[in-house]
Amino acid sequence: MLLLAASAAGYAQKPRPEKLDRGLVVARGNADGSYFASWRLLATDSPSISFTLLRDGKPVKENITGATSTAVEGKPTSRWQIVSLRDGTAIDTTKAVLPWQQPYLRYHLQKPSAGKDYDYTPNDCSTGDVDGDGQYEIIVKWEPTNAHDNSQDGMTGPVFLDCYKLDMTVPANDPKRLWRIDLGPNIRAGAHYTQFLVYDFDGDGRSELMCKTAPGSRDGRGNYVNQASDSKDIRLADNGRDWRNSRGRVNGGQEYLTVFDGEDGHAINTIYYMPNRNTGYGRDAPGTFQWEPKSRSGDNGDNGNRGERYLAAVAYLNGFDKAPCAIFTRGYYTQAFAWAVTFDGKRLHTNWFHESRDKEQYSVTDSLGRKNTYNAPAPTSGSGSGTLFANGNHNLSIADVDGDGRDEMLWGAAALDDNGKILYSTGYGHGDAMHVADLIPENAGLEVFDVHEKKKEYAWDIHDAATGRIILKGGPEGIDNGRGLAAQIDSTTGAFYFWSAGDSDIRSAADGKVVSGIRLPINFRIYWDGDAQDELLDGVNIRKWNAGGSKLLGIFGDVDNERKRTLTARNGATGSPMAKGLRSFQRPSLSFNGYGNPASNNWTKNTPCLQADLFGDWREEVVYRDRDDNSTIYIYTTEIPTAYRYPTLMHDHVYRMGIVWQNVAYNQPPHLGVNLPKEIKSSRSANY
């Protein structure tokens, strides 16, 4: 068994990890009535820390120094605890938890009342510790069934945000709801509108929630959010007015940003959202601004497409020893704006405001209101936009890519430095998906795999996350490449591979060579079965790449009888470890069907409500809605043993920021800021 301590490189120059408890969970086994216990190792733990597992107050396994999970025997009424020991002396004992009685947790939620022609389903979720007890809560976005994409007309029902307790001490089917926020009629429902951030913004140990609001939005106490403003104009706005036009577009009225208390949901502070739909500040802002270039047909606020595309993230822009910033953006097909905001516990403040109104110049307004205009650097590809203009994706990522102790914002085909200035642009234009990780261990730092929707010369590229230097580029010319994935599917090499919808060949991130023509899922990656490689999460199935060809997953379901997909070897791949893995790939390797009635979200995106390391050891949990009962969600956790002891993924900064932005627009999976197989190889081994 391998003992993995967090490497100094992996956790240096990062924020202080959030305070979490051991996250002990005990779930019923698949068939024989046994249980599987799993708990957190923290990045702050000493490498010599050990654990004792208690059942009904008596030791079951003592001085555990290996993996923080184990199979155990018990009863449905057994109460379990973890004792943490330093040099053999107990330093902490967890609260007692009751076991799950299935290999999953079923939560019955309080669904909002249906409207005249629509109902509600749980959609994107997020997580944060809203009450400071070291346990995560879950925040659920309720999506009306008449939600629309920005390209579509139509009325929608209001969006609701709920917060529920995740209390593992008594895993009841009916969790306690802490609050509900009603965003009202003037926030349209759809994937591109409500991007909500759950994080501890003021450093008090409790998470807040931030999102875009409007007149008519109500907080967790039922009060209108505009009453939490210092602005008289905002407080006097008409909360009874419906600003939607006959096409269902919200083309007028004030637009706000509100920060909500995480524990009871009350609105703490509301300010004008920057920019408004006319790219100005405040007031009712009737939609007249042309978001398309003059050479094309107009897209103003009445049409509500280009100017209603939002993204959001959390980033440590002022240093990891300072409070984090919320970043809210508007537009990416053409004009693009990014607004960094801080929260001091009482008020929201602008950190900086970035404007990319064309391809050659951009401006940044600082916290004191001083605006400076800059010429953009030349795109690293040699052509295209040099600013955020037309270079954004339907998603974004956050990481300290240049090692200065401050985060940068990865925009797709461009990046912003911590001060709001352009770090670089590749010029490759708009894309649907991207992945930021240590894709190429031989290249210092992180890399970006970007999938291009813009019909240009290349369908994808990999570029250096710090400099924008193009490392690889390729794929069919002139296509709309809608989706792609980069993952470490072969732990024997520790290498990343990538593939996409428009270029399904599997390629090595190291050199771009095709290793197979087999088609793999292009949705999420996940750590599930306990090795150091990624599994592939697609809908409610986890698909497994078995490099040795010796094992298939079956803990949650039988392996599909579909014929094995045989490798079409190219570029000398025959006989390589990768090729052997391809030969043994079967699908699906694991299905959640039969364990509850789970369903994925967001149409062809096939995404879960949430994927995150919510509790237990370093493997990830998955949250799904019920296929038929719109009041129910499921939380699944792995019960497969692992040989590795590793800190909770939530203490990896890049990963934690990824959980915050996961709900944004076209959801993307989180990645680590370190190369996990490389971390394992560099860690000391021990025989346990």
Segments and roles (model prediction):
Residues P17-G23, S34, L41-S46, T52-D56, ...:
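Beta-propeller-forming repeat regions
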Residues M1-Q13:
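Bacterial Sec-dependent N-terminal signal peptides
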Residues L3-A6, V26, T350:
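Generic detector of low-complexity/intrinsically disordered segments
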Residues A27-G33:
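Short, solvent-exposed loop/linker segments at the N-terminal edge
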